């Protein structure tokens, strides 16, 4: 059995339609395996507005069509849910996301 250990590099995007990009890096070869851009740049999120009612509405609206489990880690929905909509504190949301992901995240501002 071959195990590939991943590290995720998280970037805040300075331009374009998305807020962030997560790149999955093979920790042994240091090569990018997959990347996911997420978070519509023109919209707010829980880490910005900190409104629990808006968070609940977001979660209810997206719950049925997105995979928020570890198997959905390569989807924008997974990243938006855990990084942008899990906690009003970005640093706490980052820790929550890392726990849900099961892999190390390196935030590269």
Model feature map: region roles:
Residues 3-109:
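Arg/Lys-rich, low-complexity, intrinsically disordered basic segments
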